[in-house]
Regions:
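SH3-family beta-barrel domains
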Residues: 20-38, 48-53, 60-101, 105-134, ...
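Second-shell loop/turn segments in exported
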Residues: 40-44
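Sec-dependent N-terminal signal peptides
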Residues: 6-16
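N-terminal secretory signal peptides that target proteins for export/translocation
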Residues: 1-4
Length: 148
């Protein structure tokens, strides 16, 4: 009987853990200045302010018109949906090489530094075509944060 109880507990933990991750998607900031609040309402105090349009964030929860987000550095809070959009960006978590084509054998165009905000145009397999200030090219998706 104890074994059956343990099996049920493990099953439910795995099942509910999977459900909680299903709501996690990446979003981006619509504006250059976005308030992050302690709670999911305009009456909640402002916790901090983001000042970077297109910054990717992970949505981890939702309540009515607010989304709970977490950033690359594990800062979290609530943002109104009017300030968010479908993610079109990512951040390099390590220095990366930008290539002309989606292969490591292609001509290297530039070195992308860790922390650089990247605008994602499209992805194929484990490569994404990105733009970053002066450069446009392909980058491997490993060590990139913000991709759905």
């Amino acid at each position: 009987m104890q074994i059956i109880k343990k099996i049920y507990i493990v099953f439910f933990l795995l099942f509910f853990t999977h459900i909680s991750f299903a709501n996690e998607i990446f979003v981006s900031l619509k504006k250059n200045k976005v308030n992050v609040r302690y709670g999911p309402s305009f009456e909640s105090d402002i916790k901090y302010v983001y000042k970077k349009i297109n910054l990717p964030l992970k949505q981890i929860d939702k309540k009515e018109n607010f989304r709970r987000i977490i950033d690359l550095k594990n800062n979290s809070g609530w943002i109104h949906i009017s300030q968010l959009k479908k993610s079109n960006s990512a951040i390099a978590t390590k220095d990366k090489v930008l290539f002309k084509k989606p292969t490591s054998f292609a001509k290297p165009i530039a070195k992308i530094k860790q922390g650089r905000l990247l605008i994602v145009e499209k992805c194929e397999k484990n490569w994404c075509k990105i733009t970053s200030e002066k450069f446009e090219g392909w980058i491997k998706t490993d060590n990139i944060w913000g991709l759905n």
